């Protein structure tokens, strides 16, 4: 499901490598994480050692891949990248590990999707810098141990809770990335616009930031489309009015909800009296797959307090009624507390 407000990377989407920050000082947001990583990098570099293994986790689109690349650049070492789904066999990972040079950074995206047999050979590699392989089959099979160069594994996941405990415990530096504030996103947007040559002013940046769901990837995607509308309309500057008009044409409202989000909320409120309603029922009501409802639509609505999960099903909160301009039942409480969605 391709949505302009999705934090997930989309097929054929431009990578915007030229827009990415190159150093920690250029990286906007995540101040505590940056401060801690800077200390760890300086310490490892001063000792001439590999940085401890790093686990980057949190919602999609917050810059985990960019941060991994910056770590390698700040350490002055090579950067190798792969992903959990690509490493189908133990030999795939072994080929990468044996070609790493001392202190290199290996980045594995979506590490929660790593196959169990591949994960098993990662344990000794991370802990003891050795690779235990079985050569041959049957009675003639033998175990071979290969020494590896000390390296740093930087792994990224949106589902840290799916990692096996032995794997999670081997990361000496866990880093949770948080949603961005509107001010931080506005800074990201102004920097990106300058590099793109887009005539974005601060009021336009704040308007886009308010609808970007706290996610730089979404902000960048919205900026590209707003730039297109501004060029088509002959706008000399992208101010708040121009940005709002373009975003309205994209059907992204003032808090970042799109048509699919609103259709979900209306189905829950108008078809099922605000709930409780089961996820399967809601999926049928809006003609979407259950996985899409749970993984794509609901996370932001839960995080923002529009809906809540209960043992009996989904329920609309007062904020959902207010946003849609509907009268909430008198006995309905306020918004649900933000759900911790991304490490379950």
Swiss-Prot record:
Subcellular location: Cytoplasm
Main EC class the enzyme belongs to: hydrolase
Location of region: Small ATPAse domain (RuvB-S): 181-251
InterPro entries per record: AAA+_ATPase, AAA_lid_4, DNA_helicase_Holl-junc_RuvB, P-loop_NTPase, RuvB-like_N, RuvB_C, WH-like_DNA-bd_sf, WH_DNA-bd_sf
Positions of the UniProt region annotated as Head domain (RuvB-H): 254-344
CDD domains: AAA (cd00009)
Binding residue positions for Mg(2+): 65
Biological process, per Gene Ontology: DNA recombination; DNA repair
Binding site for DNA: 290, 309, 314
EC number(s) recorded for this UniProt protein: 3.6.4.-
Region: Large ATPase domain (RuvB-L), residue numbers: 1-180
Principal subcellular localisation of the protein: cytoplasm
Binding of ATP, residues: 19-20, 61, 64-66, 170, 180, 217
Keywords from the UniProt entry: ATP-binding, Cytoplasm, DNA damage, DNA recombination, DNA repair, DNA-binding, Hydrolase, Nucleotide-binding
Role played: The RuvA-RuvB-RuvC complex processes Holliday junction (HJ) DNA during genetic recombination and DNA repair, while the RuvA-RuvB complex plays an important role in the rescue of blocked DNA replication forks via replication fork reversal (RFR). RuvA specifically binds to HJ cruciform DNA, conferring on it an open structure. The RuvB hexamer acts as an ATP-dependent pump, pulling dsDNA into and through the RuvAB complex. RuvB forms 2 homohexamers on either side of HJ DNA bound by 1 or 2 RuvA tetramers; 4 subunits per hexamer contact DNA at a time.
Name of the molecule in the record: Holliday junction branch migration complex subunit RuvB
UniProt organism field: Phenylobacterium zucineum (strain HLK1)
Primary gene name: ruvB
